[in-house]
Amino acid sequence: NTFELQDEDGTNINSSAFTAYSSAGTASRVYTITSPYTEAQLRDIKFTQSADVMYLVHPDVSIRKLTRTAHTTWTLTEADLLDGPYLDENTTATTMTPSHSSGDDRTITASTSTFASTDVGRLITFDSGYAKIITYTSGTVVKADIKDDFAGTSATTAWSLGAFSDTTGHPAATTFFEQRLVFGSTATEPQSLFFSQSADYENFKAGTDASDAMIFAIASDHVNVIRWLAGTRSLLIGTMGGEFIAKGGGTDSALTPTNIEIRKQSNYGCASIHPLSISNVTVFTQRAKRKLREMVYDYDTDSFVAPDLTILAEHITETGVVEQAYQKEPDSVVWCVLTNGKMVG
């Protein structure tokens, strides 16, 4: 229990006036929990939190829900989304036929090869009702647990497969906005936003009522893969090609399935690094990972602008940023981990 104190120049500090140090107390072990993520995936995890519940997303891993019910009671489970979201309804002649209209471990048969082994865990819906695929048998046959009863057992061309799966990829970004849980970007839908029902975070049953779930895609002349989401006065959307906002049309209008605007604000492009919400601004790393920008609302232009925070010292982050975090106290500091392993703030 002996040690030496030195200042930043390596000079020994005179500790003769310090009180004696003796070992006392023990440090509690940090709580650990098993997760499905590999070390290589850690930096691509995005998350959003509501009280004691946190949702975590990674494009290669199904959505996880971390719940704390006591200081030493934590659970990490797969999020059980209800009735969606789904891809567009089938437009081919392929039919689906369920063996039963209700129950678990029921057979669903496709008229042509449609399924893949990576569809296990994926949702499927018909004219009404939906099920979760639990077993892959072949390209035309799977077994599923029916979560909401089907209307019948007749063959139908009116079916849709879930938007999230190991086949299509899983969301790469998430946040809360206007009482909705929002996911963004999968491998097959890189520009799409998936909104839950209002105040019912895991219910993704879509419709046209104001509180219903909804899916919208960024319409642009380039592919703008969504990198991150942030909920502020508008929903901020960081993409590879630029920065967008989504909000309800009209002054102070809520975002609904029939009232949504998505507008581009700037063209800098974003890295896949979780943004930082600081006061009334959102700090993000530009696509090349060498600049930090703050996305802030500008009353003069009635839009969001993103000035360069590193313009006076661009050499500091020249090697590239891989992680960032915000310290509130005792001083307000944005800390960045660089590709060379150093940390700057």
List PLM regions with ranges.
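Short, surface-exposed terminal/edge motifs of secreted or surface/virion proteins that either
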Residues: 2-4, 58-78, 140-144, 188-195
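Aromatic/His-enriched, Gly/Pro-containing loop or helix-boundary segments
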Residues: 8-51, 150-162, 211-225, 263-270
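Elongated alpha-helical scaffolds
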Residues: 35, 39-64, 181, 237-238
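Beta-propeller and closely related beta-pinwheel folds
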Residues: 37, 157-331
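Structural hallmark of WD40 beta-propellers
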Residues: 52, 332-334
